[in-house]
Amino acid sequence: MSEKFEVKDLNMKPGMSLKIKGKIHNDVDRFLINLGQGKETLNLHFNPRFDESTIVCNTSEGGRWGQEQRENHMCFSPGSEVKITITFQDKDFKVTLPDGHQLTFPNRLGHNQLHYLSMGGLQISSFKLE
């Protein structure tokens, strides 16, 4: 995976949305967006995989992965421009894809504040937390 973008003091709370705009690198077979407490504790691992034509969402606690949730709605491709919105709610995350389709993923770890954001495989043009 190409270089990563990281924020370690995010302060995202329920009711807030993260809006990401960027371009997927041309030479990747997947990209990722992680939200959580740190590298080892991820409340949301969002991972579109071009080589599998699927979007994988998961959690990681202490470096141990949970059960994958797979969605066969692939609206991404290498080199494409993307706009993704992730809304953090008490019990789940709503991810709005570039074509307007929404995915829901449960907040399995139950945290009410997220401190960590990382992204890979994307050239970020903007991100906004509101």
From Swiss-Prot:
Q: Name one GO biological process term.
A: cell-cell adhesion
Q: Which GO terms describe its cellular component?
A: galectin complex
Q: Which residues bind a beta-D-galactoside?
A: 65-71
For molecular function, the Gene Ontology terms on record are:
carbohydrate binding
Q: Which UniProt keywords apply?
A: Lectin
Q: Which domain of life is it from?
A: Eukaryota
- Tell me the ranges covered by the Galectin domain, including all copies: 4-130
Q: Which InterPro entries match?
A: ConA-like_dom_sf, Galectin-like, Galectin_CRD
Q: Does the keyword Thylakoid apply?
A: no
Q: How does it assemble?
A: Homodimer.
Q: What is this protein's function?
A: This protein binds beta-galactoside. Its physiological function is not yet known.
From the Swiss-Prot or TrEMBL record, give the protein name: Galectin-2
Q: What species was this sequence derived from?
A: Mus musculus (Mouse)
